[in-house]
Amino acid sequence: MEADGQPRRPWQTDPLIQMKILSVHNSYQKPGGEDQVFAQETDLLRSYGHEVLLYQSSNDQLAGKNALLLLGDTIWNQQSYRELRALMQRERPEIVHVHNTFPAISPSIYYAAKEEEIPVVQTLHNYRMLCPAATLFRDGHVCEDCLGKRVPWPGVMHGCYRGSRLATAAGAAMLATHNYKQTWSKSVSAYIALTDFARSKFIQGGFPPEKLFVKPNYLQTDPMPGEGKGNYALFVGRLTPEKGIGTLLEAWREIGRELPLQIAGDGPMAPEVEKASGAMESVTWLKWLPRAEILQRMKDASVLILPSTWYEGFPMIIAEAFAVGLPVIASKLGSMASIVDHQRTGLHFEAGDAIGLAEAVRWWAAHPAETALMRAQARSDYETKYTAEVNYAQMINIYESVLKRSVSKELAVPAGASKL
């Protein structure tokens, strides 16, 4: 009890005190980056002594349900609401951290937390709350047709989610319903955007700026820096159109032997990459490599190429590159432009501009002194932004900010008055 007679929670006097956190995630049929981040952050919080409760669902649980039931559950899953509310009543966590609710869990859980007066933090791993496809990308181009619209009808018309109007309609109905109910602004205490760019997009989409924090993803372990003596450029990732594979190959037709290119990855555009590798001596397709070998090639590479033509969420490959001291030549677009600092930790070029990429690579090959400095600066960015220790401090600061706001609201309610 303080001098003013008001109670204080333990974390207000000791910021390192252990908290009880309920972490919520709807995992994907094919494990991806969001699933990995969910697991990493759970382990990180537990390693600092916090108690982390888990509520998880999987898309596998949707098997056998008819379309109408799936649509209803995507908008409001009453079972999730009941289960989460019972769990919160039993365990009384101090905070609920949501990673993904789509499609099985649904936004009903925000209301369960609100009824129990427990603040909610939501990590924005993608753009799903702005776009039915979650990517802001359609037909090979950035698309913002649904951005800021209460009813995202363009997405349904184009069948943006999995190429299906019916599947897209489920996500669009969820967005329209909760836009109307003002769920995003009234039932979530704070959002975590992964980059400054993503934060700006959510503000543009109508999210309250004061609730939007920025916390990037991080690496669990430090791979340690390399020396970059391999004299080659490197691409690592899925071989898909939105990753800019066409731009990459076209640029190397211009570059020729000035700087060899190694491509590590597989995917739908593998035949085009294989053909280019056979036709150009300077291009080598490595197919998909084990993690340890990819890291070693990153340590030896001169520069990483990231020519994506969509906004990206948070490309972990950039954090990994910076960790080994590898600068990045990236599209001047979306999150890539937020993370890669032009002429400090890499270079930018206009997305889709193969000639611009070729010019950036030629500049790179001709300026070894400048690029050596960029290697050191890339490593410095990793140490100050993308380590587990830095990420933990950022996460706890966000939690504490949310909890302090929650306490302030409690104290603002006069004695005997009801809390709305």
Description of each model-found segment:
Residues 299-313, 326:
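Acidic donor-binding loop of glycosyltransferase active sites
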Residues 271-292:
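Nucleotide-activated donor-binding/catalytic signature segment of Leloir-type glycosyltransferases, i.e.
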Residues 356, 363, 370-385, 391-397:
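A short, well-ordered alpha-helix in the C-terminal region of glycosyltransferases
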Residues 35-36, 231, 235-254, 268-272, ...:
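A conserved mid-protein helix/loop that constitutes part of the nucleotide-sugar donor-binding site
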Residues 342-343, 347-354, 363-368:
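Conserved acidic donor-binding segment of nucleotide-sugar-dependent glycosyltransferases
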Residues 129, 148-224:
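Donor nucleotide-sugar binding/catalytic pocket of nucleotide-sugar-dependent glycosyltransferases
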Residues 88, 288-289, 296-301:
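Short alpha-helical donor nucleotide-sugar binding micro-motif in glycosyltransferases
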Residues 318, 327-330, 340:
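Short hydrophobic beta-strand element within catalytic cores of glycosyltransferases
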